Amino acid sequence: MRVSFDGGRLNERGVAVALYDYAFHARLQLGVEPVVLHDASAAVEVDQVARFAALFPTHAYRNPEERRALIEEQRIDVVYALKTTRPRYPMFPGRRTVVHEVFRFFDPHGDAYAYISPWLAEAAAAGRYPAVPHIVDPPPPRGNLRAQYGVPREAVVVGRHGGPDQLNLPYIPQAIEAALAARSDLWMMLLNTARFSHHERIVHVPRLPDRGGVADFVASCDVGLNARLGGEAFGLAIAEFLAQDKPVLVWEGGRDRHHLALVDDPQFRFRTREDLVRALLRFEPRPGAGRWRARVAPFAPEPVMQTFARVFLEGPPRARPRLPLGFRMIARAKERAQRWRDSHWMTA
């Protein structure tokens, strides 16, 4: 079976990481022949494309017509789309087309339709469509980066990585600077993060070329920090900390809320600027004893790929149940209340 894997652009973000993992484990565990398709209509990140091309046949398209031609030329049996935009993914007659929603859309189409987390499937579709979660399988760390960046061994290190512009709660710079001023052993290590301060104990780590480098970065930290205004529909960056049995401080707000399913301990959640400052001041490193690693055990390659095969590769086209009566009206009311709540927390 030849399966095309299309997630749009190939970069260092979570969608491309997930696409790579699905393609890799589909071949390893399910015996499929993966073919990676990627959007080259905008600037291409050559190093990221090379990472895929080293393991899979990888082909660029610049428009829908080129993508359709590639699917025909490559004799694709199943067209898999990790979908990040609102418009529907096109159908390809004679080929099974399956759609995997990354965001909170509800537009069932294709021969199979699913979401990237149990929380998202419930929030977007009342649980009437399945979840095929992202794989959490980072490589083991080879060491850590503290010495390389001049961070003392005895320091308490808070780490963050993700999209450069996604540490975007408005009060984050002030909260971090206040905590650094009050605690002399506290350091911040920020990977691939837009600079907001020149404090001597804030270390900016540039984008790393491979997943091993990210694992080394996580190993350098005692606790993670996630402060994304929109929340997380899955939260791979959070999961990479949990996989090394390290806790993560997470904002309790956001439209998307799977991060709260991953981190369910109230002492590692914050709402306001003062909450975060207090959390940074009171945190003391201690062994996780497997507690945090257990949170991501369901996302190991084997169980995820069993679900992937069952939902996307097997059986006839799936039924498309409707949402419950009144579901969207109730969801919109909840979202309005959440926006008001989040606005209050950001200004408190």
Language-model segments: what does each one mean?
Residues 215, 238-243, 257-258:
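Short alpha-helical segment that forms part of, or immediately flanks, the ligand-binding pocket
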Residues 76, 216-233, 246:
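Acidic donor-binding loop of glycosyltransferase active sites
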Residues 6-13, 20-67:
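N-terminal strand-loop element at the rim of the active site
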Residues 134-198, 204, 211:
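Conserved catalytic-core segment of nucleotide-activated headgroup transferases in glycan assembly
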Residues 104, 111-141:
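Donor nucleotide-sugar binding/catalytic pocket of nucleotide-sugar-dependent glycosyltransferases
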Residues 14, 284-336:
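A charged, aromatic-enriched C-terminal amphipathic alpha-helix characteristic of glycosyltransferases
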Residues 263-274, 281-285:
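Conserved acidic donor-binding segment of nucleotide-sugar-dependent glycosyltransferases
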Residues 247-252:
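Short hydrophobic beta-strand element within catalytic cores of glycosyltransferases
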